[in-house]
């Protein structure tokens, strides 16, 4: 451990003790060295004992800085790791930090583009429009056409900080199984690895640019969602240039009502956008918190969302989409047996899982929820309860499902904030039923044939030759099998004779030994000779 890492570790320990987070460690896990170490640091008392544990954890992460704040935000989506009260507190973490100097941002952009800023942009505002832990945003206009744009710039000093803190997180993750009784099941190293991947993705703005381009193409000319245009010629790994948008923050309910927005339609469109991304496109915006969503000023009675910050996206493969849709439909119908079977068929839980026990566990958790009116049931929390129950049956953590569940909670919470009477189930069920019908009906078959048509048109001229080669290969294989069967039969016959002769030879040799022991003079010699000859004959059959 380097001196800087040691200093950082000491700071982390001091902050954790100042907020009383040693309470997270059960007394039975506090070994003698830990007790001695804690007593040596007697002056580092819990200075926030009047606050609940979840709030203290949130405040400690805020004190440690942006890297730990983002880590806490990610942990808030992993509700299998913490009690609900702690997870709810972690969800309150805000990724807001003071902006760095605009002159430094200018130098960073010029270094990335390889020239003075005025070569490409006019009216660059050195005052940041928005600032977060990884990057900040400045406004400008394109010199070539005068279009208003925003420039997102990675913080110049963030990478070494991230690398140092992530290394420490890995070290701390190694302690978790020793300190917490359920530490191994929580797989702390995998949690840190998942977070590291998310951070690295966010540090590469070319990846975010590609994600935004894909989402924009998926919703081209859609009345539901608008993604700003990316200007790829000016994008680099540490700089992103895209169209500047104007809209009402989706969390500003008063402003939305003031412009007479159709709140019911807006809430329903949020649900439709989510399910369209997941099931039609297999590519969904996985960071849809209110800070990244706006509503267009235009056509408030036909409202349109505007999405920004596409650094984190998720995707599902075809099998996952099908199983997830069938799971949702089974939930709508309260068919818990079907839900249990789908989890096994999909490979999400081990194949030897007891279906009856799994079905009973799902029913126990979910049935009380469905006794409520539909507009009071949280789709996201049903999914959360299902995944937590499945983990008791050794369900492997599915990163794509964790992202999906987090996004669904965002979408549902946002929809209920806009329109409290939102019935997400009624909105989603027809969409899912139509999607499943499209996957198994005649249109799906025709689409599959059309997709494979170029491949088969290329292979069709080769088909007679391939068929002839296959028949010849089958004939040669059959001949080889016949020869092998014949040889095995002969070998089996020879081995049978050999075993027979070995048995006779062994019997004669044993008889000779017994006669020698009872002092009969002549017979043993003859038996030894005969037994030896027969044994040698049997040995020759084995060759």
Swiss-Prot record:
Binding site for ATP: 129-137, 152
Residues annotated as catalytic: 287
InterPro entries: ABC1_dom, Kinase-like_dom_sf, UbiB, UbiB_bact, UbiB_kinase
GO-annotated cellular components: plasma membrane
Pathway(s) of this molecule: Cofactor biosynthesis; ubiquinone biosynthesis [regulation]
Keywords: ATP-binding, Cell inner membrane, Cell membrane, Kinase, Membrane, Nucleotide-binding, Transferase, Transmembrane, Transmembrane helix, Ubiquinone biosynthesis
GO molecular function annotations of the record: ATP binding; protein kinase activity
Superkingdom assignment: Bacteria
Topology in the lipid bilayer: Single-pass membrane protein
Ranges for domain Protein kinase: 123-501
Main location: membrane
Subcellular location: Cell inner membrane
CDD domains: UbiB (cd13972)
Physiological role: Is probably a protein kinase regulator of UbiI activity which is involved in aerobic coenzyme Q (ubiquinone) biosynthesis.
Family: Belongs to the ABC1 family. UbiB subfamily.
HAMAP family: UbiB
Name of this chain's protein: Probable protein kinase UbiB
Organism: Edwardsiella ictaluri (strain 93-146)
């Amino acid at each position: 451990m380097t001196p800087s890492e040691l200093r950082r570790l000491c700071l982390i320990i001091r902050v954790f003790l100042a907020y009383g987070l040693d309470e997270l460690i059960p007394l039975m896990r506090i070994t003698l060295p830990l007790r001695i170490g804690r007593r040596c640091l007697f002056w580092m008392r819990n200075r926030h004992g009047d606050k609940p544990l979840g709030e203290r954890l949130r405040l400690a992460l805020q004190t440690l800085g942006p890297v730990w704040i983002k880590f806490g935000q990610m942990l808030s989506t992993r509700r299998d790791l913490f009690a609900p009260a702690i997870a709810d507190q972690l969800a309150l973490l805000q990724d807001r930090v003071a902006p760095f100097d605009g002159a430094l941002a200018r130098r960073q952009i010029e270094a990335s583009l390889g020239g003075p800023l005025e070569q490409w942009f006019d009216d660059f505002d050195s005052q940041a429009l928005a600032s977060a832990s990884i990057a900040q945003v400045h406004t400008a206009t394109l010199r070539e056409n005068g279009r208003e744009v925003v420039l997102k710039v990675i913080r110049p000093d963030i990478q070494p900080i991230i690398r140092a803190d992530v290394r420490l997180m890995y070290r701390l993750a190694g302690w978790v199984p020793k300190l917490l009784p359920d530490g191994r099941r929580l797989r702390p190293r995998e949690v840190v690895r998942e977070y590291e991947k998310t951070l690295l993705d966010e540090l590469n703005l070319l990846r975010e640019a590609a994600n935004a381009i894909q989402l924009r193409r998926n919703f081209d000319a859609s009345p539901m969602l608008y993604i700003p245009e990316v200007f790829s010629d000016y994008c680099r790994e540490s700089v992103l240039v895209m169209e500047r948008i104007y809209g009402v923050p989706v969390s500003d309910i008063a402003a939305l009502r003031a412009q007479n927005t159709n709140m019911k339609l807006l809430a329903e469109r949020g649900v439709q956008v989510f399910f369209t991304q997941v099931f039609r496109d297999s590519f969904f915006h996985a960071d849809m918190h209110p800070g990244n969503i706006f509503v267009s000023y235009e056509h408030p009675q036909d409202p349109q969302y505007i999405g920004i910050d596409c650094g984190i996206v998720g995707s599902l493969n075809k099998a996952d989409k099908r199983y997830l849709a069938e799971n949702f439909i089974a939930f709508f119908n309260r068919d818990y047996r079907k839900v249990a079977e789908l989890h096994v068929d999909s490979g999400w839980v081990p194949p030897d899982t007891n279906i009856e026990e799994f079905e009973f566990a799902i029913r126990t958790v979910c049935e009380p929820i469905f006794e409520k009116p539909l507009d009071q049931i949280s789709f996201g929390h049903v999914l959360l309860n299902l995944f937590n129950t499945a983990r008791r049956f050794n369900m492997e953590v599915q990163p794509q499902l964790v992202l999906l569940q987090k996004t669904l909670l965002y979408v549902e919470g946002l929809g209920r904030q806009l329109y409290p009477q939102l019935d997400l189930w009624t909105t989603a069920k027809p969409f899912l039923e139509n999607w499943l019908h499209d996957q198994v009906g005649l249109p799906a078959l025709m689409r599959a044939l059309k997709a494979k048509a170029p491949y088969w048109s290329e292979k069709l001229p080769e088909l007679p030759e391939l068929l002839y080669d296959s028949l010849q290969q089958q004939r040669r294989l059959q001949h080889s099998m016949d020869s092998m069967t014949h040889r095995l039969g002969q070998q089996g016959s020879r081995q049978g004779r050999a075993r027979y002769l070995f048995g006779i030879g062994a019997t004669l040799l044993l008889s000779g030994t017994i006669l020698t022991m009872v002092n009969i003079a002549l017979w043993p010699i003859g038996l030894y000779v005969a037994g030896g000859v027969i044994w040698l004959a049997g040995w020759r059959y084995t060759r």
